[in-house]
Design a protein with these regions (language model features):
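N-terminal basic/disordered segments at the start of proteins
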Residues: 29-59
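A generic, well-ordered mixed alpha/beta core segment in the N-terminal half of proteins
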Residues: 152, 165-177
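Beta-strand initiation motifs
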Residues: 56-61, 183-185
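Helical "lid/coupling" subdomains associated with nucleotide-phosphate turnover
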Residues: 33-35, 49-51, 73-98, 112-120, ...
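Short, Lys/Arg-enriched N-terminal segments with co-localized hydrophobic residues
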Residues: 4-25
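Conserved beta-strand/loop subsegment of P-loop NTPase cores
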Residues: 107-109
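Short, non-transmembrane amphipathic alpha-helical segments
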Residues: 517-538
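Short flexible coil/turn linkers enriched for glycine and charged/polar residues
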Residues: 31, 41-44, 101-104, 130, ...
Length: 541
């Protein structure tokens, strides 16, 4: 059920109350395991309220969409205006009323590039918190991608396809990623989103008779490096996200007056290449007003339709794809699934982590690390973590930090073999690890930095700026990583099995190896003091 305005919402609730009978209806609301996802985007404020059950089924109860000028403000003046801030808070306050009406158990509110790139970002987020009570997380592009991939994965099976190209057009950027049987093989982003493109080149529109041609030239210039990577690859599927694709699909479907065939994506559809090209030729010659009146769309949609079509047209030319697959999903759906995984411990959570790790191995391969050594250190580090849970009492999130740091601890060798630890820190901090926030990257980079002889110190600025809890997390995980690294100093993977036993203040590492491990034992003892200092037990072989 879609709520077009807030008054309709209360009419609907009253009618439902009368239809079911008061007690029955109130019981249904009370029993509903409701969650909510709020997306504060560049063009729209969106909220989805859903009901989840133990069968991993999410049923949308309410979708609310309100237009906003956040992106227009940010991409033109780099600041969000006071007027836009007031409008945003007004609508979000109404969102919170719906959250109370549905007795939502858990919610997640996020903002994307419109707020993320605004110079007054912190002021806006604080005003939202004070005026509405909503705690909004300003996510980065990789987190945004993680939620979208999660949403797609619940509605399809990308793992079964050999090679998939995913093109995600947001208001601020275009992100291109390649997946091979579910593993990320390539990712790159270009800041030519539909709204940013329109705002960046807007002043040229009155100076040329062929503004679409100017935009196309600009797009091709920005996508040059991406083109060289993907133009010779054969994709089983081109998946399109965002960029008013649903509007484009509806226009084409209405024009053909028949439903397109269903594809492998549940509730998904596709646009045939020839149909898209025909629409491209028509819209390319139209003004925003002509688009609005011809296709019955709002002005906001009309002004984004042309740049979106031009961007997708560029990718169709590059890939020779026969169609564009359109998962009928959204960023909000991905957030809802993420909330559901946390609440119900859904099996797909492990699958989501696999996407993160595949993106990490993509980075590792790019920096030409020793994959066997990295995989061995990862295995040993996670084994130590799992067998010492009673000592450190850390959770799955921290385990993921350790896993990523273990894989990437040597990436700095690519830049400087002599000072590779600090270079590993610098490289990791500047990576796009899918699903990782800026804070996640900072913690992981610190853990990787201290994998060798160096230990965390207050004089290290990047360690000093962490809060006390995060400092402790870094120290514990780097202490574990040090020992894992020490046990493969030869890079020969000599240790076949590792079992830990404890006796008072001693932690025994029982190693099974068929080779001489004198070097490993020596290096282990050199790195054991820091482990004892942090965790209070002395590791012994």
């Amino acid at each position: 059920m879609t709520c077009r305005n807030y008054h309709n919402k209360y009419i609907y609730l009253f009618e439902k109350y009368m239809y079911l009978g008061g007690e029955v209806f109130m019981k249904k609301i009370k029993e509903a395991n409701a969650i909510a996802a709020i997306d504060i985007g560049s063009n729209y404020l969106r909220m989805s309220i859903a009901e989840i059950n133990t069968d991993e089924v999410i049923k949308i109860l309410e979708d609310v969409i309100k237009p906003i000028n956040i992106g227009k403000d940010t991409f033109t003046s780099k600041k969000i205006s006071i007027q836009t801030m007031h409008q945003t808070c007004y609508h979000l306050k109404n969102f919170t009323q719906l959250i109370r009406d549905y007795r939502v158990k858990s919610y997640k509110a996020i903002s994307t590039s419109g707020i993320r790139e605004a110079e007054n970002k912190q002021y806006i987020l604080e005003q939202i918190r004070l005026r509405t009570g909503l705690n909004v997380e300003c996510i980065n592009a990789t987190q945004e991608r993680f939620f979208m991939i999660k949403a797609i994965n619940y509605n399809s099976n990308l793992n079964s396809l050999k090679q998939v190209l995913v093109v995600n057009i947001t208001s601020g950027a275009v992100e291109v990623s390649i997946y091979e049987k579910g593993r990320l093989k390539f990712i790159e982003q270009s800041k030519i989103g539909s709204l940013r493109l329109r705002e960046t080149l807007g002043e040229l529109e009155s100076k040329t008779l062929d503004f679409p041609a100017i935009m196309e030239q600009f797009i091709e210039n920005k996508l040059y490096s991406i083109k060289s990577t993907i133009e010779n690859l054969n994709f089983e599927c081109l998946v399109g996200l965002g960029g008013e694709l649903k509007t484009i699909w509806k226009i084409i479907r209405a024009k053909s007056n028949s439903n397109n065939q269903k594809h492998f994506l549940k509730d998904g559809n596709f646009i045939k290449r020839e149909d898209f090209m025909q629409l491209y030729k028509h819209i390319r010659r139209m003004t925003n007003d002509q688009i609005r009146f011809t296709y019955g769309v709002s002005y906001k949609v009309a002004e984004l339709l042309l740049p979106s079509i031009l961007i997708f047209h560029c990718f169709l030319k590059i890939t020779k794809s026969k169609n564009i697959q359109i998962p009928m999903t959204s960023l909000r759906k991905g957030i809802l699934y993420d909330l559901a995984e946390d609440l119900l411990d859904i099996n797909k959570k492990k699958e989501s982590q696999n996407y993160i790790i595949s993106s990490v191995w993509y980075i590792a391969e790019k920096y030409r690390i020793n994959k066997k050594h990295a995989a061995f250190v990862e295995k040993i580090a996670l084994s130590i973590f799992d067998q010492t849970k009673k000592l450190h009492k850390l959770g799955e999130k921290e385990r993921l930090y350790l896993q990523v740091a273990s894989i990437l601890h040597d990436v700095g060798i690519f830049v400087d073999a002599c000072n590779h630890c600090i270079q590993s820190y610098n490289i990791i901090c500047n990576q796009n690890i899918i699903g990782f926030s800026d804070k996640d990257l900072q913690l992981t980079a610190n853990i990787a930095r201290y994998h060798s002889e160096e230990t965390p110190k207050q004089s290290h600025k990047d360690y000093y700026i962490l809060c006390d809890q995060d400092k402790m997390t870094v120290s514990i995980l780097s202490a574990i990583l040090k020992l894992a690294e020490a046990l493969d100093i030869s890079h020969l993977e000599k240790i076949k099995e590792l079992k830990l036993t404890s006796d008072k203040d001693l932690l025994y590492f029982n190693l099974n190896s068929e080779e001489d491990i004198v070097l490993e034992e020596w290096n282990f003892m050199r790195n054991s003091d820091f482990f004892e200092e942090v965790l209070g037990v002395k590791p012994m072989i």
